[in-house]
């Protein structure tokens, strides 16, 4: 029995427990459902609530929360005028509560009782559209704010804008600006257009119109010239790359040469505009014009070279010619002077005898020009003497005038009245200056010409240099180690050229001849000597003299000639030369053909020169042979006679007839002046 009671107790307990749990679950689920429903209702209510108006002035009336403003009432810290609702009892915007007592609120202020205070105008649900919507604009509606602190406000109808109490037409609703931005104004609206559009006014109304794409068809030109094309309101603008400029609405090449910056066409061969690495122009000038850099250091111009045609005169008279902007000036060589002829300068041979530098008529037969200086022909009893480089006729014979030098140098001086000879003391040797010999310190000539045994003559030149003539068996050699006359002949110096080109060198007295290997030709060098050269080379100036030749250009199989104005390349046999344009081939061949079958020129030439009414006779090159081609061989490279040898060039017009004077040891005889010819004429 007792066990049954215990079992019943536990059974009952379990039933009660189950019932309690079931009831609790029911309560919990119900609470959750209520909470969800409440939340859902709140969300729906919130979604249905209209938003607050944009403008505070849109409100007609409003339910206040605590501490919110009560209409137009003012607040005083003395508590006389209530403005804020300190507790939760306010039910309208103008409901006022202050203190523990209250009464109806009036326009000003009132004492308060314990009752809730309402403003009669808005209290008890009177804040609604039914009562106040007449305060809205005719183009507005009244809207209830369905929320805890709700109220009523005005809202402009669609197509209008404002605070609801005053509504204006909303022109922006019609999107009058198109792609632009429309902004409402009191007067209407305004448009702000994007860069792709422009603002236009049509019938006093603004709108945005799309700009045409003027650049679509590449009006500025190809991309290689154009940096950018920019559309404007009514057109386009071109931005060109370096080296190009806008012309006629397109990018065109900048032609820096269009304005002829190089100068007039007469002097410009070519003007080229260069665009890389930077924009510039380049000039090449015609013959007779010089490319000149202007003072800005950048610009160039072809300026006329007024010296190109050698207006100052022949080269022997001219030291230099300086071309200027509008003319030239001449600097004449020694023995020449500037003379203005028809307003232009020219160097003419100076009349150095004009002031009778040789002396009085009692002493002088004649004063005559001699190179860039003058010489004196003296009467009997007078001798030509040089003092400080100037010649004059001094009374006395050569020996009494110490022509050989001072006693310290001269062993003996002998004279026959017209010629004199010098015997020098040891340590001195014969030297020549101004055509007159004297005893000079031996080491002076030895240091320039070589030993006394090797040197035939040592001539001191006006320039300060030395001209040496070697004895037979000696040749002149200049090198880093040897200078002067050394033992050997002309061929010992290998003058004919490289070994592969030379078959043999043939010595001929003080000169030589060359025989060349097959494939090489013999040419004449500017100094009159020969050399074996490659026929395609320019060795030996095969094109001719510098007066005619602008350039010789070597090739692989032949050479070519570029000639100066007035000359043209012409073939003479197998040789190409620059010759005057009027040169006849037959005349040229006959003028340059050797007189005998061995290629030798005449051995002696007699020159008759007439000065005023006096005939002057002189032997110019007696006994000198121009033998240059042995065995009768003809060489087309050898058409003109070479210049005179060193010995020939050394002879002056005063001494040529007396070169046979003795030069044995240190004794020599030389005339102080040439004897008058049998015809009674005089020497010049």
UniProtKB/Swiss-Prot annotation:
GO terms for cellular component: membrane. PROSITE patterns: ASX_HYDROXYL, EGF_2, EGF_3. It comes from the Eukaryota. Glycans are attached at residue 660. Residues 168-203, 211-252, 441-480 form the EGF-like domain. Disulfide bonds join 172-182, 177-191, 215-229, 220-238, 240-251, 445-458, 449-468. InterPro entries: ECM_structural_protein, EGF-like_Ca-bd_dom, EGF-like_CS, EGF-like_dom, EGF-type_Asp/Asn_hydroxyl_site. The keyword Oxidoreductase does not apply. Probably interacts with MIC3 adhesin during the transit through the secretory pathway; however, the observed interaction is not essential for the targeting of MIC3 to the micronemes. Monomer. This is Micronemal protein 8. The lineage of its organism: Eukaryota, Sar, Alveolata, Apicomplexa, Conoidasida.
